[in-house]
Swiss-Prot record:
Subunit structure: Belongs to the 40S cdc5-associated complex (or cwf complex), a spliceosome sub-complex reminiscent of a late-stage spliceosome composed of the U2, U5 and U6 snRNAs and at least brr2, cdc5, cwf2/prp3, cwf3/syf1, cwf4/syf3, cwf5/ecm2, spp42/cwf6, cwf7/spf27, cwf8, cwf9, cwf10, cwf11, cwf12, prp45/cwf13, cwf14, cwf15, cwf16, cwf17, cwf18, cwf19, cwf20, cwf21, cwf22, cwf23, cwf24, cwf25, cwf26, cyp7/cwf27, cwf28, cwf29/ist3, lea1, msl1, prp5/cwf1, prp10, prp12/sap130, prp17, prp22, sap61, sap62, sap114, sap145, slu7, smb1, smd1, smd3, smf1, smg1 and syf2.
Name assigned to this protein: U2 small nuclear ribonucleoprotein A'
Species, as recorded: Schizosaccharomyces pombe (strain 972 / ATCC 24843)
Domain LRRCT: 122-160
Principal location listed in the UniProt entry: nucleus
LRR repeats, residue ranges: 19-40, 42-63, 64-85, 88-109
Length: 239
């Protein structure tokens, strides 16, 4: 199911037990987040539980949104601008997804209001330093995986990882390991048809596909690869 304007206009909203205006997008097999600008930022919460989303990104600026439920999807990457476009996000559920490395969660450090985060049943949750690193990297957190963040954990995190501006070797080593979550060339080649799930509203021309493949081939760093991943999944073409 694609998130087009007609579909979004028919999706039910309701007042949740937390007194939030919530949009219910559960169980629609949604592959990509798109076209949310038509909602006009009138929701406090959006529930994307039980879909097929792989990339947590492509949001318009939504100042009202405080709760985002994305459990049981296929998410492997988070947009680096998530804190900029969702500045008041407080609660985020990423339970039962495919997040692999601790540094894959680094974009959440840009969310200044994030107090409640769940990443249980992701491979990353089994990593050494997972909990301690997130407490250090996201100082606003009060609850992580349904457990309250304690003062002694904050002190221990600072002891292990140092200051954000001056991280220890352990912190730097964690920051340097990020999943190469997609083979972009394979994605482009495997979705040549119109209305591909990796685009947002138009078909890639042969020239655009070649441009993307050339950009991938010339990428010189993981950061550049990640930038190209984000551009492709948001339907943007490298210049």
């Amino acid at each position: 199911m694609r998130l087009n304007a007609e579909f979004l206009s028919q999706v039910p909203s309701f007042i949740s037990p937390l007194k939030e205006t919530e949009l219910d997008l559960r169980w629609y097999q949604i592959p990509i987040i798109e076209n949310l600008g038509v909602l006009r930022d009138v929701h406090d919460a959006i529930d994307f539980t039980d879909n097929d989303i792989r990339y947590l990104g492509n949001f318009p600026r939504m100042k009202r949104l405080q709760t985002l439920l994305c459990g049981n999807n296929r998410i492997t990457a988070i947009a680096p601008d998530i804190g900029k476009v969702l500045p008041n996000l407080k609660t985020l559920s990423l339970a039962q997804n495919h997040l692999q490395e601790i540094a894959d969660l680094d974009p959440l450090a840009s969310c200044p209001q994030l107090t409640n985060l769940s990443c249980i049943d992701n491979p990353v949750a089994q990593k050494q330093y997972y909990r301690l690193y997130l407490i250090w990297r996201i100082p606003s957190l009060h609850i992580l995986d349904f457990e309250r963040v304690r003062r002694n954990e904050r002190l221990r995190a600072e002891e292990v990882f140092g200051q954000i501006q001056n991280p220890t070797e352990i912190a730097s080593s964690i920051m340097g390991v990020k999943s190469r979550v997609f083979d972009l060339a394979a994605l482009v080649q495997s979705h040549p048809e119109a209305n591909s799930p990796i685009t947002t509203g138009y078909t890639l021309t042969p020239e655009e596909r070649e441009k993307i493949k050339e950009a991938i081939k010339n990428a010189s760093s993981i950061a550049e690869i990640n930038r190209l991943e984000a551009m492709l999944l948001e339907g943007k073409i490298p210049k």
